């Protein structure tokens, strides 16, 4: 077959009759006395002649397009022939042979056809760049020969059940199974389970695939028209189901080589890292290669992975628990034991070990490899925070009154700091002298602040190898020497920032140090950490300063300090335990050892909420032409769903409404996503991809038959009363939205206070 295909293309510029002798002699190598496989030739031409088409055939197509469309269906044993054909295709441009019928010339192209053939140079470049993307991503540590179909079968089982314990059992059993074959299978498999391509702080891992691109790819790969795909999508709202249905009824010329976990994961990373000219075409080519090889339910979950939403009710913390159980059994060589149960206290200890490790080193590859090398029960010794990897920041619980603060810290030594109205900034100095700045959700935002150089704030560079600081980046007026509102900070560019372009200066207000010269400080008291901070760093007015603080338990002094913080353009106070184990830094935890007291929220629920924009309602009157209101939802961390909690239309300026219209309109989708939990009576005029968070104030919370937040806890959902827009949260991803559990907790605390 390899010779046959090569012969077909090499002779493609000749009339069909003159090519037949060559084709008839180009069968597979045969032993002496064996006749050429003419039946194979007949099937080959018949499949091309009978290829279903739509639209008007182009009078001339590039041979590269014709070839790649046909070769999207070739893999496995035909890989050699594919490469040879691609090398040859770019030197030929052919017209459709009339004797084979017009169907041959109208084989659908994967690239937009203008009726003009690509030049050989353009064709060669596109093919080469696609293969470069694949080869450059060929990392051995992501290799896995586990059939992708096995992962999809697990996803299918999980989708059909709701019991969290059963999901944990299914996941842990599968992790144990693949570790028996090879422990290297675990890393790419885990990333597929949590639907990520690497750690959050690694740049360039956003797939960036819109619905239209995926629809077009499914259309061209599966021989369906765009109108058919869109009609079906409007009906069922699941591109994965559509791709599975279309793929399973489509015949292929060759039996594709089965997909593996390693292949799928590497290709997903290659798609994410594909940028620049023709990037969309190159991404489509990579998707087609996988989609063509999909069987059964594989297409369904491949497309969902490409959408970055599996929608099977598998939360990341469930995967972490499953991993801890599997790794614990792996350590104890109990995978084959008929009784895999382990004592609950041991299992809970293993779960806590892996949670703590991941909060300090949010990188599954490092955490899993450390477990495999040292054992999960030794993670706290070998897998700890390190400069260059952003740990998940400690967070504070909201409170509504100074009396509540005094009650919480009664008999304890505590301290209060200004709560600055800026952007959380975790600053790392690395051994090689480079600096990195990370946001609260782990995004590398070093390039956003070119004017900051941490080495300017170090007391002794000769003795300081590395460190990690916890700070707030605040807009600063250098002329008047004062803090500017957050709205001023938000006007700074977020990408491609040049030093000469900086108009809004920032000052770093440091309030904690977490690591110094490889010494982990999070298990020291806040009082000790403050001593480290002032010893190794120095104040540079207007550039690097310490958070203003006071240590007192006097009610009047605290009230005065709160008023002063507001007068200095701050949000309020952060009140923290100062001494003892309770003052240790707890990565990722929203702890009652840190309380936030915001002046604006003393009469409300005690805190603002960060809610995801799910849809919008058209404006009327003076708001005609923009959106007049928005449907907001919280995030359920257990199910991965967004649960509606209010409609908001207050707090917006005309300028903000126009900005939101321009920002959100490109994200409109045809209907609600399967992860949106809502009541039809609150259905908006348009639905959006979940991309944007609003920070919202509310007077209080109430139960509602219309909204769905926390409905798993109550008979009704929890809704916000009189919500008011504050700002867009640029520093948070949508999965960092206020959770359903947090809304339930706020409602219960409010009810308790009222009673």
From Swiss-Prot:
Residues 47-79, 97-127 are annotated as: Disordered. Residues 1-44 form a transit peptide. The record marks 164, 441, 622, 647 as: Interaction with target DNA. Its EC number is 6.5.1.1. GO terms for biological process: base-excision repair; cell division; DNA biosynthetic process; DNA recombination; lagging strand elongation; maintenance of DNA trinucleotide repeats; mitotic cell cycle; nucleotide-excision repair. Residues 102-114 have a biased composition (Low complexity). The keyword Coiled coil does not apply. Keywords: Acetylation, ATP-binding, Cell cycle, Cell division, DNA damage, DNA recombination, DNA repair, DNA replication, Ligase, Magnesium, Metal-binding, Mitochondrion, Nucleotide-binding, Nucleus, Phosphoprotein, Transit peptide. It holds the Pfam family DNA_ligase_A_N. It catalyses: ATP + (deoxyribonucleotide)n-3'-hydroxyl + 5'-phospho-(deoxyribonucleotide)m = (deoxyribonucleotide)n+m + AMP + diphosphate. Residues 309-318, 493-495 are annotated as: Interaction with target DNA. It is an enzyme of class 6 (ligase). The keyword Hydrolase does not apply. The modification Phosphoserine is found at residues 58, 75, 119, 123. The active site is at 419 (n6-amp-lysine intermediate). ATP binds at residues 417, 424, 440, 576, 590, 596. Mg(2+) 2 binds at residue 571. One of its GO terms (molecular function) is ATP binding. Belongs to the ATP-dependent DNA ligase family. DNA ligase that seals nicks in double-stranded DNA during DNA replication, DNA recombination and DNA repair. The mitochondrial form is required for mitochondrial DNA maintenance but is non-essential while the nuclear form is essential for cell viability. Cdc9 is included within the category of so-called 'start genes', encoding proteins which are required in early G1, when the cell is faced with the option of initiating a further cell cycle. This is DNA ligase 1. It comes from Saccharomyces cerevisiae (strain ATCC 204508 / S288c).
